[in-house]
From Swiss-Prot:
It catalyses: dUTP + H2O = dUMP + diphosphate + H(+). HAMAP family: dUTPase_bact (MF_00116). InterPro entries: dUTPase, dUTPase-like, dUTPase-like_sf, dUTPase_trimeric. The gene is dut. It is an enzyme of class 3 (hydrolase). It comes from Clostridioides difficile (strain 630). Its EC number is 3.6.1.23. Transmembrane segments: none annotated. This is Deoxyuridine 5'-triphosphate nucleotidohydrolase. Its cofactor is Mg(2+).
């Protein structure tokens, strides 16, 4: 088991938590009230900083309920939090709906998943090996 260290920047901040045992994503909470007009984005503060375990990253993903019920989602999904980042976690939300959306203080606004990463050596080559797929992409397998 890995430990995720969390520092509150504000006494009102909520520590990320899992809604159910076995969930992959832990909920992230807003520390402020913000209105997001239709078609606009806002950067929402969480009031926390984290220290990830060695050789991991955190991915910030949307909450399905916000997307389905309010057409509000995380804009850069998944958002990547690198292991060495120690600043406040902030979530970019976009309102695809037709009405203003009010982010309430302590509202669940996104979920965060901690994933392992690999130590990668980048090697420039003249040629790549062949594969069954080759260069096929962008609908090449049909619709």
């Amino acid at each position: 088991m890995y430990n995720l260290k969390v520092k509150k920047l504000n006494d009102d901040a909520i520590i990320p938590n899992f809604a159910h045992k076995g969930d992959a994503g832990m909920d992230l909470y807003s520390i402020e009230e913000v209105v997001i007009p239709p078609g606009e984005t806002k950067l929402i503060k969480t009031g926390i900083c984290i220290e990830l375990p060695t050789m991991t990253e955190a991915q910030v993903r949307p909450r399905s309920g916000l997307a389905l019920k309010h057409s509000v989602t995380v804009l850069n999904t998944p958002g990547t939090i690198d292991e060495g980042y120690r600043g406040e976690l902030k979530i970019i939300l976009i309102n695809h709906g037709k009405n203003d959306f009010k982010v309430e203080k302590h509202m669940k606004i996104a979920q965060m998943i901690v994933k392992p990463i690999y130590d990668i050596n980048i090697e420039e080559v003249k040629e790549l090996s062949d594969s069954e797929r080759g260069k096929g992409g962008f609908g090449s397998t049909g619709f």
